[in-house]
Amino acid sequence: MSTPRVYVIHENPEWFPPLAAAFEAESVPVGEILLTADSGTEGTNGNDQPSTGSIDLAADPAPGIYWSRMSASAHTRGHEHAKEYTRAVLGWLERAGRTVVNGSHVLELEVSKVAQHGLLRNAGFDVPRTTAVFGKGDLVSAAERFTAEAPGQPFITKHNQGGKGLGVRKFDTVEELAAYVDSPEFEEPVDGITLLQDYLLATEPFVTRIEFVGGRFVYAVRVDTSAGSFELCPADACEVPTPGQQGTAAPGQQGTAAPGQQNADADPFSIREDVTARHPLVQRLEAFLADNRIGVAGIEFMETTDGRHVVYDINTNTNYNPAVEATSPVSGPRSIAQYLGGLLAAEQALLTA
């Protein structure tokens, strides 16, 4: 029988070191379950020996707390089946009664912006006007119908499944979209679903990402979008595309700062001190996370020129920016280690009572 620990289910080793350091600093035993095509499911078969990429469905999973941080962009790193592997592992863990943070229902949110949009809209949040288009053939005609409701207004496309700004482009006309769809540059969504959304203007060229751990506020991050990139991943390991690429513009970008004019030495991520745990939107989001049993998340919103607070993304495999971590009195990774370590201690106390 293995020693109870926190098991982290993921597919990208490059994102793990800050978390590993946090678990070590908090003296929380941790193990990785790396679900890639060439990896096993170490520790899940009830002992400390790595398996060969399989699980015995009749065996009990190793004791401990399981935290899923599978990424919707796994396929961009050559891990096309990682999400399916995770579905299988999470189902096995949940049927066995193990404690799983960000379980199967959260994975389905991570891999579907359609699901995120529906959940946020049903909860009463202001969300972007969105049409989901299945396949490539109807994309242009769907855009014609979409733009007819807001003539002359620009719009964006994005992939239903995937982070890192996958498939996100701004178009001023349907004709521009038609040319893109017929060009070699067209990015086919991994699940075949492309979203059409209103292009929203922010009061200033930034968006805000609020980090939550254990469903509670950690800090809010100001993300400068003046350089024009849709790549908002805060981790050092994320590859940020060249600012100002033709056809792209970041959420909230305005003419006051043209693409490519952002200070090259300035980190686009910084603490937003005016957004605290007492902010009305933060309190609503905490209630939303509790209602939907989402333990760890980064949620993004923008403040628009017409006075709206538009919530547009739920990221359940959140990464933390080093520059933000260096200036924040609270650490995201340490908060996770403390939260999961607390769950582990509580579970062990029940077992030994």
What are the language-model segments listed below?
Residues 2, 97, 105-205, 248, ...:
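Active-site nucleotide/adenylate-binding loops and adjacent lid/helix of ATP-dependent enzymes
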Residues 8-9, 213:
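Short hydrophobic segments within beta-strands
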Residues 71-74, 160-162, 317:
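Short glycine-rich anion-binding loops that position phosphate/pyrophosphate groups of nucleotides
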Residues 73-77, 164-167, 322-323:
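A short acidic, helix-capping loop that chelates divalent metal ions and anchors anionic groups
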Residues 166-289:
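Phosphate-binding site of ATP-dependent enzymes
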Residues 261, 290-296, 303-353:
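C-terminal active-site "lid" helix and adjoining low-complexity regulatory extension at the edge
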